[in-house]
Protein backbone atom coordinates (compact mmCIF):
# COMPACT_ATOMS: atom_id res chain seq x y z
CA UNK A 1 0.00 0.00 0.00
CA UNK A 2 1.53 3.31 -1.13
CA UNK A 3 0.82 6.15 1.30
CA UNK A 4 1.87 9.73 1.78
CA UNK A 5 5.32 11.10 2.56
CA UNK A 6 5.01 13.17 5.71
CA UNK A 7 7.79 15.34 7.08
CA UNK A 8 8.68 15.93 10.70
CA UNK A 9 10.86 18.90 11.66
CA UNK A 10 12.04 19.96 15.11
CA UNK A 11 13.98 23.09 15.93
CA UNK A 12 15.21 23.83 19.44
CA UNK A 13 15.07 27.60 19.21
CA UNK A 14 13.01 30.15 17.35
CA UNK A 15 16.02 31.47 15.41
CA UNK A 16 16.73 28.08 13.79
CA UNK A 17 15.43 27.61 10.26
CA UNK A 18 12.97 24.69 10.04
CA UNK A 19 12.78 24.79 6.22
CA UNK A 20 16.44 23.79 5.93
CA UNK A 21 15.81 20.34 7.40
CA UNK A 22 13.60 19.02 4.59
CA UNK A 23 14.66 21.18 1.65
CA UNK A 24 14.72 19.31 -1.69
CA UNK A 25 12.55 16.55 -0.20
CA UNK A 26 9.06 15.88 -1.51
CA UNK A 27 6.49 15.59 1.28
CA UNK A 28 2.73 16.12 1.23
CA UNK A 29 2.52 17.49 4.78
CA UNK A 30 5.01 18.72 7.38
CA UNK A 31 4.68 18.76 11.16
CA UNK A 32 7.02 21.26 12.85
CA UNK A 33 7.83 21.47 16.56
CA UNK A 34 9.73 24.34 18.13
CA UNK A 35 10.77 22.50 21.28
CA UNK A 36 13.59 20.63 22.94
CA UNK A 37 14.22 17.09 21.78
CA UNK A 38 14.54 15.80 25.32
CA UNK A 39 10.76 16.06 25.71
CA UNK A 40 8.81 13.45 23.72
CA UNK A 41 5.52 15.18 24.59
CA UNK A 42 5.73 17.61 21.67
CA UNK A 43 2.42 18.86 20.20
CA UNK A 44 3.30 18.38 16.53
CA UNK A 45 4.93 14.99 17.15
CA UNK A 46 1.72 13.88 18.87
CA UNK A 47 -0.29 15.25 15.91
CA UNK A 48 1.96 13.36 13.47
CA UNK A 49 1.54 10.11 15.41
CA UNK A 50 -2.25 10.55 15.24
CA UNK A 51 -2.20 11.52 11.55
CA UNK A 52 -0.04 8.82 9.95
CA UNK A 53 -1.64 5.69 8.50
CA UNK A 54 -0.38 2.32 7.34
CA UNK A 55 1.64 2.74 4.15
CA UNK A 56 2.79 6.29 4.95
CA UNK A 57 6.45 7.28 5.19
CA UNK A 58 7.65 9.71 7.85
CA UNK A 59 10.67 11.69 6.66
CA UNK A 60 13.00 13.22 9.27
CA UNK A 61 16.24 15.14 8.61
CA UNK A 62 18.20 13.15 11.21
CA UNK A 63 17.71 10.90 14.21
CA UNK A 64 18.49 13.65 16.70
CA UNK A 65 15.58 15.70 15.35
CA UNK A 66 13.17 12.92 16.34
CA UNK A 67 14.64 12.07 19.76
CA UNK A 68 17.64 13.00 21.89
CA UNK A 69 18.23 9.65 23.51
CA UNK A 70 18.39 6.10 22.24
CA UNK A 71 15.46 4.79 24.28
CA UNK A 72 13.05 7.45 22.99
CA UNK A 73 14.32 7.00 19.43
CA UNK A 74 13.82 3.24 19.48
CA UNK A 75 10.37 3.61 21.07
CA UNK A 76 9.20 6.12 18.45
CA UNK A 77 10.59 4.12 15.51
CA UNK A 78 8.98 0.96 16.88
CA UNK A 79 5.64 2.74 17.48
CA UNK A 80 5.59 3.90 13.86
CA UNK A 81 6.83 0.72 12.18
CA UNK A 82 4.42 -1.49 14.15
CA UNK A 83 1.61 0.50 12.54
CA UNK A 84 2.99 -0.15 9.06
CA UNK A 85 4.59 3.28 8.75
CA UNK A 86 8.08 3.56 7.25
CA UNK A 87 10.51 6.05 8.74
CA UNK A 88 13.30 7.61 6.72
CA UNK A 89 16.27 9.49 8.18
CA UNK A 90 17.85 11.65 5.47
CA UNK A 91 21.20 12.54 7.09
CA UNK A 92 21.95 8.95 8.07
CA UNK A 93 20.52 7.51 4.82
CA UNK A 94 18.48 4.93 6.73
CA UNK A 95 14.92 3.65 6.24
CA UNK A 96 13.10 1.53 8.80
CA UNK A 97 10.03 -0.60 8.10
CA UNK A 98 8.10 -3.15 10.11
CA UNK A 99 10.24 -5.95 8.62
CA UNK A 100 13.56 -4.72 9.94
CA UNK A 101 16.45 -7.14 9.90
CA UNK A 102 18.88 -7.63 12.78
CA UNK A 103 21.29 -5.42 10.79
CA UNK A 104 18.71 -2.61 10.61
CA UNK A 105 18.13 -2.85 14.36
CA UNK A 106 21.88 -2.71 14.93
CA UNK A 107 22.17 0.37 12.68
CA UNK A 108 19.36 2.10 14.57
CA UNK A 109 21.06 1.37 17.90
CA UNK A 110 24.54 2.38 16.72
CA UNK A 111 23.47 5.56 14.92
CA UNK A 112 21.14 6.51 17.77
CA UNK A 113 23.95 5.97 20.28
CA UNK A 114 26.25 8.17 18.17
CA UNK A 115 23.62 10.93 18.10
CA UNK A 116 23.25 10.69 21.89
CA UNK A 117 27.05 10.73 22.32
CA UNK A 118 27.40 13.73 20.00
CA UNK A 119 24.79 15.64 22.02
CA UNK A 120 26.66 14.83 25.26
CA UNK A 121 29.93 16.11 23.74
CA UNK A 122 28.26 19.35 22.64
CA UNK A 123 26.88 19.92 26.14
CA UNK A 124 30.29 19.19 27.70
CA UNK A 125 32.04 21.64 25.35
CA UNK A 126 29.36 24.22 26.08
CA UNK A 127 29.88 23.85 29.85
CA UNK A 128 33.68 24.08 29.43
CA UNK A 129 33.29 27.20 27.29
CA UNK A 130 31.03 28.86 29.85
CA UNK A 131 33.48 28.01 32.66
CA UNK A 132 36.40 29.52 30.72
CA UNK A 133 34.38 32.61 29.82
CA UNK A 134 33.39 33.09 33.48
CA UNK A 135 37.07 32.86 34.50
CA UNK A 136 37.89 35.60 31.97
CA UNK A 137 34.92 37.65 33.18
CA UNK A 138 33.32 37.50 29.75
CA UNK A 139 30.27 35.41 30.65
CA UNK A 140 27.62 36.89 32.85
CA UNK A 141 24.75 34.49 32.16
CA UNK A 142 21.30 35.56 31.17
CA UNK A 143 20.21 39.14 31.84
CA UNK A 144 18.12 39.42 35.00
CA UNK A 145 14.40 39.96 34.52
CA UNK A 146 14.25 42.63 37.23
CA UNK A 147 16.62 45.35 38.39
CA UNK A 148 17.87 45.19 41.99
CA UNK A 149 15.40 47.95 42.91
CA UNK A 150 12.48 46.09 41.30
CA UNK A 151 13.49 42.85 43.04
CA UNK A 152 13.55 44.62 46.43
CA UNK A 153 10.10 46.11 45.77
CA UNK A 154 8.81 42.70 44.73
CA UNK A 155 10.10 41.10 47.95
CA UNK A 156 8.56 43.86 50.11
CA UNK A 157 5.16 43.57 48.46
CA UNK A 158 5.18 39.75 48.62
CA UNK A 159 6.12 39.89 52.32
CA UNK A 160 3.25 42.35 52.86
CA UNK A 161 0.91 39.66 51.56
CA UNK A 162 0.07 40.78 48.03
CA UNK A 163 -1.04 37.87 45.80
CA UNK A 164 1.94 36.36 44.01
CA UNK A 165 0.09 35.78 40.74
CA UNK A 166 -0.85 39.47 40.66
CA UNK A 167 2.75 40.50 41.38
CA UNK A 168 4.05 38.22 38.61
CA UNK A 169 1.63 39.80 36.10
CA UNK A 170 2.47 43.31 37.26
CA UNK A 171 6.24 42.75 37.01
CA UNK A 172 5.77 40.84 33.73
CA UNK A 173 7.55 37.70 34.98
CA UNK A 174 6.45 34.10 35.40
CA UNK A 175 5.42 32.84 38.82
CA UNK A 176 8.46 30.53 38.80
CA UNK A 177 10.73 33.55 38.26
CA UNK A 178 8.90 35.37 41.05
CA UNK A 179 9.54 32.46 43.44
CA UNK A 180 13.21 32.41 42.43
CA UNK A 181 13.49 36.08 43.38
CA UNK A 182 11.77 35.38 46.70
CA UNK A 183 14.20 32.51 47.47
CA UNK A 184 17.31 34.64 46.88
CA UNK A 185 18.49 37.90 48.39
CA UNK A 186 20.70 39.19 45.56
Swiss-Prot record:
DNA-binding span(s): 164-183
Biological process terms in GO annotation: DNA integration
Residue ranges of the region described as Disordered: 17-38
Signal peptide positions (record): none
InterPro entries reported for this sequence: Homeodomain-like_sf, Recombinase_CS, Resolv_N, Resolvase-like_N_sf, Resolvase_HTH_dom, SSR_resolvase
CDD domains, sorted: HTH_Hin_like, SR_ResInv
Active site: 12 (o-(5'-phospho-dna)-serine intermediate)
Domain of life, per lineage: Bacteria
Any Pfam family hit: HTH_7
Residue ranges constituting the Resolvase/invertase-type recombinase catalytic domain according to the UniProt record: 4-137
Annotated keywords: DNA integration, DNA recombination, DNA-binding, Plasmid, Transposable element
Entry GO MF terms: DNA binding; DNA strand exchange activity
Chain's role: Resolvase catalyzes the resolution (a site-specific recombination) of the cointegrated replicon to yield the final transposition products.
Family indicated by similarity: Belongs to the site-specific recombinase resolvase family.
Record-given protein name: Transposon Tn501 resolvase
Species assigned in the record: Pseudomonas aeruginosa
